[in-house]
Amino acid sequence: MKAVLFDLDGTLLDTLQDLTDATNHTLRHFGSPEKTAAQMRYIIGSGAYFQLQEALGENLAKVDIQQVYAFYRAYYDVHSTDKTAPYPGVVEAVNALAKKYPVGIVSNKPHAVVAELCARFFPGVYALGEQAQLRPRKPEPDMIRKALEDLGADSCVYVGDTQIDVQTARNVNAPCLCVLWGFRDRDQLEAVGAEHFCETAADLAAAVEKLMKG
């Protein structure tokens, strides 16, 4: 059986402003320059550790990244839905696909945050985030394999918006549908071998269906 697996940030949910706010709250506390949302757009994708390391830049050597991460998590876990919302049309697309196929959401965010966001915006849809007992995270195949096992599927179409997603799909021999409303531009995705694209959420279900039948 084939499933449909989605990335979360930049694919289903517009989390950019909440991630930017949490990062800047953290940067201010540790004496580092803030980032604009435009800058953050190209940092997001590999999880909060990488995000914070990139945002700190040359100041990374001056701080304890574990303390930085703990401070960030304490803020973001409380404010993760302040400005976050689904991209227009994606809820309808996910619900339509869920009537035909096993559907899941797999994110590098901590599992507790993923579960809360998905319960709020995609109730009833399988959700999996990073857990201590389930590493390494994407783009390694472990989380995808776990999701497929839980869904009773043996393969998938994977939907995402970053280079990490393209590599994730490649690592499980799955076709990757790249959405173009997320955190990366088409040329960045093509540079890592992306072949399938979706420009609007109105076309999302049909684009997935095409790959499911391919």
Give residue spans per PLM region.
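N-terminal helical cap/lid subdomain that shapes the substrate entry/recognition surface
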Residues: 2-91, 99
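Substrate-recognition element of Asp-dependent hydrolases with the DxDx(T/V) motif
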Residues: 23, 90-118
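Substrate-recognition "cap/lid" segment bordering the active-site pocket of phosphatases
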Residues: 82-83, 110-159, 163-172, 186-188
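Glycine-rich phosphate-binding loop signature in dinucleotide/nucleotide-binding domains
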Residues: 98-101, 150-154, 211-212
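Glycine-centered short loops/turns at secondary-structure junctions
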Residues: 100-101, 173, 193
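Short, glycine/polar-rich helix-capping loops at beta-to-alpha or helix-loop-helix junctions
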Residues: 181-191
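Short acidic-hydrophobic, aromatic-tinged amphipathic segments that line or gate anion-handling sites
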Residues: 196-200
